[in-house]
Amino acid sequence: MQTYDNPNIKYDWWAGNARFANLSGLFIGAHVAQAALTTLWAGAFTWFEISRYKPEIPMGEQGLILLPHLATLGFGVGVSGQVVNTYPYFVIGALHLISSAVLGAGALFHTFKGPRNLKNTTGSARKFHFEWNDPKQLGLILGHHLLFLGMAALLLVGKAMFWGGLYDATTQVVRVVNHPTLNPFVIYGYQTHFASVNNLEDLVGGHIYVGLILIGGGIWHIVKEPLPWAKKLLIFSGEAILSYSLGGIALAGFVAAYFCAVNTLAYPVEFYGAPLELKFGVTPYFADTVKLADGGYSARAWLANAHFFLAFFFLQGHLWHALRAIGVDFRQIEKSLNAISSAE
């Protein structure tokens, strides 16, 4: 992290992972713990939403954010988007809770029993030790991240083609996608209007391409260190890597917000409510186009706006850490502004 030439800087508890940015073993433990918390929330909140779900009220009007995703994946859904069985949701919630326990145990192991720094260990674990100024090792770790993202994209393809299918909002039934679109011109054509996709064949075909590209990129980064031009262009430091990550999350959040707001194939009206419209107040926001009872908001409104505002703050984090990475000292800016004020 940026220390401004102070090698003895001490981070308090609120600094998060910065406290052990140079301890690769504890750094892994922190990430595993964060994964455990994420899966714990997903499992527990799925069960909570099951307890609140009312079959007689449209799902999109109940303020649910997880069950609509599971229904879109074809779990427990019958004709016309009717939820006929909530037991699959219970099982999925349980699997997430069990996974969180396993991940939590892994986090505790890495925190209390594992080596604090993988540099001091032996065997295959040592190859995951990294230094923030080592482009080759950072590329290796990036490659493994891309492999997992690619496999996740292909899991959706597997669900669509082999494991029960997806809910098709155009026909209002769960169906298997037998012939996904593989024409690269069709898939690439969505670059300028990705949110207009209106058939499962194109949606699944896009995931095939994305999954394969991610896996290909992962293999590339594992076996090949960054090219000379990348080493010259990019800054390799903890602060810079954090800024790149936050920027990527911000971009994904903005894309997800818009996609959720307007697309009714990946986000069916039956589960999320009607499409939204963009409005402007103190800030831009997405508003329901259908008035709900008791002044409530649709699941689509909750998700789109949450993604938008979270993405906005991730973008601020990206800019903050990017500026710090290139050497901007915000303390000096404050001193300069105070000096100007005093002079006046």
Curated annotation (Swiss-Prot):
Functions as an antenna for photosystem I (PSI) under iron-limiting conditions, when phycobilisomes disappear. In the (PSI)3(Isi3)18 complex most of the harvested energy is probably used by PSI; in other PSI-containing supercomplexes a large part of the energy will probably not be used for light harvesting, but rather is dissipated to protect the organism from light damage. Belongs to the PsbB/PsbC family. IsiA/Pcb subfamily. It is found in: Cellular thylakoid membrane. Its cofactor is chlorophyll a; all-trans-beta-carotene. This is Iron stress-induced chlorophyll-binding protein. Signal peptide: none annotated. The chain crosses the membrane at residues 25-45, 89-109, 138-158, 203-223, 240-260, 303-323. Chlorophyll a. Under iron-starvation forms a complex with PSI trimers, where the trimer is surrounded by a ring composed of 18 IsiA subunits. The gene is isiA. Keywords: Chlorophyll, Chromophore, Membrane, Photosynthesis, Photosystem I, Stress response, Thylakoid, Transmembrane, Transmembrane helix. NCBIfam families: PS_antenn_a_b. GO terms for biological process: photosynthetic electron transport chain. The keyword Thylakoid applies. GO terms for cellular component: photosystem I; plasma membrane-derived thylakoid membrane. The lineage of its organism: Bacteria, Bacillati, Cyanobacteriota, Cyanophyceae, Nostocales. It is a multi-pass membrane protein. InterPro entries: PS_antenna-like, PS_II_antenna-like_sf. Induction: By iron stress. GO terms for molecular function: chlorophyll binding.
